[in-house]
Amino acid sequence: MFKKLFGDPNARKLKRFQPLVAEINLLAEDFANLTDEALAQKTVEFRAKLDKANSDEETEEILDEILPEAFAVVREAAWRVLQMRHYDVQLLGGIVLHKGQIAEMRTGEGKTLVATLPAYLNGLTGKGVHVVTVNDYLARRDAEWMGQVHRFLGLTVGLIQSSMGPAEKIENYRCDITYTTNSELGFDYLRDNMATTIQEVVQRPFNYCIIDEVDSILVDEARTPLIISGQIERPTEKYLQAAEIAKQLVPQVEEDGPGDYEVDEKARNVLMTDEGFAKAEQLLGVTDLYDEQNPWAHYIFNAVKAKELFKKDVNYIVRGDEVVIVDEFTGRIMPGRRWSDGLHQAIEAQEGVTIQKETQTLANITYQNFFLLYPKLSGMTGTAKTEETEFEKVYNLEVTIIPTNRPTKRQDLADVVYKNEKAKWRAVAEECAQMHETGRPVLVGTTSVEKSEIISAYLHELGIPHNLLNARPENVEKESEIVAQAGRKGAVTIATNMAGRGTDIILGGNSEYMARLKMREYFMPQIVKPEDEGNFAIAGSGKNSGGQGFDTNNKQKKKTWKTTLDIYPTELPTDLEQQLKEAVKFAVDQYGNQSLTELEAEEKLAIASENAPTADPVVQKLRTVYHAIEKTYHDLTSVEHDEVIQNGGLHVIGTERHESRRIDNQLRGRAGRQGDPGSTRFFLSLEDNLLRIFGGDRVAGLMNAFRVEEDMPIESKMLTNSLEGAQKKVETFYYDARKQVFEYDEVMNNQRRAIYAERRRVLEGQDLKEQVIQYAEKTMSEIVEAYVNPELPPEEWKLDKLLDKAKEFIYLLEDLEPKDIEDMTVPEIKTFLHEEVRKAYDLKEAQVEKSQPGLMRQAERFFILQQIDTLWREHLQAIDALRESVGLRGYGQKDPLIEYKQEGYEMFLEMMIDIRRNVVYSLFQFQPQRQPQQPQAV
């Protein structure tokens, strides 16, 4: 109705940008006639214009003014360097990104190329542009591949990888455009704010950021804080004992019924009943689980949570002697990530693996607050519209939908719902069989490792060949192989959450992938160091690779790069195979036999299979062979491609509605890319988690109402509405949870900014003497206010205690007597003490400098940083504890958030006072050794 009256706001927005696109197109011919040098010279012209700007506002105005020319320059450069030309819709995407908005672009519409436009334009300012992707591999690929365009035009391109040292990072952050991952960017920010000298700081002030897959970073990851932690000792036997006790506690089946604890699946929490407390105390032989001397509550709660809410092969897998988290959004394993607050240890105890040490937070920030540090932020994704409200409310980011270059031909078929899971799996298997018969490729999306194995078993029964892609290490190894052939005729692929797999399923098979896999087969065994085999397979996903590969049982197993033969559409002709062997021999001659790490070898192949310019003769030789193999395969896959299109394209089956409609849409988006035909259908059951947890009683009622056979699908409007409702409920529930995290973290965020700003001042400050003297004067004023009440007559003032306290801090004031100040007013006492402090400080400085010139300046910086870091760390723990306890105040009719803000602020002020006082005390107590010695950096 509104759309009819007022027009679609999205269409209105795009219409506003249309004249800019027309202007860029008009310039195309002029720029096509320029020489390479003249085209690159444009960068110098643009920069000269920008140099005239005197403020950030003026800079933005000039950028808007030169946008059509700059975009036309990038478009021409991309054509010359990459043989890729931006479509009009990609220009629209670039404009939206430059305006600091989110561009929603469908899978396969070339988001990577779109980012080059705003990155170049904003890179001209020299203040730095960060292009953020989800993993190291993609960052490296984009920096090498898209970076060519920027380098051709004279901008510098940097890349940040987790393995780099500080010097390398500084150099890369100084570039005009830097490609990096969200986690590395966040951790570098935290590390910079723990640095002890300004030379250790790697980042520049933030300017402009483009986030790829923005929904997965700003929404899915929003609740996950980035934490830098140090280890603390906790007795491991408590975890083991708690795990034993949790086994003996029983859950309540119905509300207020018998049982030791109640499980709240919605909030992912457990609540102990009075019987539960009593039983646990009796089993442990203690009187109180909350006893401060011997606390048990924390351990018991975590053990019960581990038992009830964290399922093996769904939330985590056990690999060797460790518990590894499985990412609920992408279905990938996340090695190195651990649950906090002792939960990971509780799961380790439950699984009987070695319990690792608990950690203490040294610095933390959520992605929400981190990305809000950028003055200008933008992002791209295939699915953002469903989370539009959140982007606008939390990040102040508008979402604009960019139309596809070719019209979509995908059919989304109606959901079918079965009474129970068993019937659903049978129906899915039958649908796969039908599609397999007709020669259509099928992709089945599941929500966990466990579910993917159930459907796999059903397909085995029917004798249907299929590939399985989940977080199990043995399957991850084969990810690139599986995805390469997922679009082949009649292929059946089962995958846990394809979100973030970053890979395109090409109908008829992906000849680029296949060629690269064939190259690996010959290249890797000759080049990779034997000790590196099996430790690591390429981590990353994207155009040319996928997955994280791991050694499943930590024993050195012989690595094989052989792939299953049926992946290739044909055998290589003898002359081509000979050419490949010669190229590999040449590589061995140049690099040495088995001389590279697996990652280095993968990188050589990655560059060989793309168009990045290279001076390495080995890569050039490999590239020639790669193109020949790719062409051989492509001639055959293109025939199969046409057949698959005739048959109707890729069919995507969803086996459960995800908690977020966005993830469902991502799965759907795998079919019908770039104007290909395709179809999608969801198979559901009334026993699915989503309906069970959030659909509640309505669904249970429906279940009884439908007295149908198990294997009869139920198609009912009422049920579909229930489903939609349940999904919206979950989305709102999680949105509220994220909003709450955001509101609570906002309190911390203001404090974090204040403390980091103070820290940076200290790091950059040349003369900290004045700062320490101010600290000391402030401390003296506070002491005066504590012992002197101006309301009382002077004879009742506690001047002796006042001076005793002052001398505790500054022993050089020991000659002062109460009689020296008894005739003064309060302001006069303060002024007098301030003067005495300055004299005392000069004395102290002379004494320290005598032992080693310049030492006092170092001592000032050292003590201020040491106190800030120590007390901030304690403050983080105290704030965490406050946050845990403040929730209970809701029962006392108080708003927990307001209480948290108030008390958090008071705690922060106290911490700032403690920092000041401790610095003053430490500096006056500081006795330098005779031999030249510097205070150690913290």
Swiss-Prot record:
Keywords: ATP-binding, Cell inner membrane, Cell membrane, Cytoplasm, Membrane, Nucleotide-binding, Protein transport, Thylakoid, Translocase, Translocation, Transport. It is found in: Cell inner membrane; Cellular thylakoid membrane; Cytoplasm. GO terms for cellular component: cell envelope Sec protein transport complex; cytosol; plasma membrane-derived thylakoid membrane. The keyword Protein transport applies. Pfam families: P-loop_SecA, SecA_DEAD, SecA_PP_bind, SecA_SW. Gene3D superfamilies: Helical scaffold and wing domains of SecA (1.10.3060.10), P-loop containing nucleotide triphosphate hydrolases (3.40.50.300), SecA, preprotein cross-linking domain (3.90.1440.10). The keyword Phosphoprotein does not apply. GO terms for molecular function: ATP binding; protein-exporting ATPase activity. Its EC number is 7.4.2.8. One of its GO terms (biological process) is protein targeting. Its main location: membrane. ATP binds at Q90, G108, E109, G110, K111, T112, D504. Transmembrane segments: none annotated. It comes from the Bacteria. It is a peripheral membrane protein. It catalyses: ATP + H2O + cellular proteinSide 1 = ADP + phosphate + cellular proteinSide 2. Belongs to the SecA family. Monomer and homodimer. Part of the essential Sec protein translocation apparatus which comprises SecA, SecYEG and auxiliary proteins SecDF. Other proteins may also be involved. Part of the Sec protein translocase complex. Interacts with the SecYEG preprotein conducting channel. Has a central role in coupling the hydrolysis of ATP to the transfer of proteins into and across the cell membrane, serving as an ATP-driven molecular motor driving the stepwise translocation of polypeptide chains across the membrane. NCBIfam families: secA. HAMAP family: SecA. This is Protein translocase subunit SecA. The gene is secA.
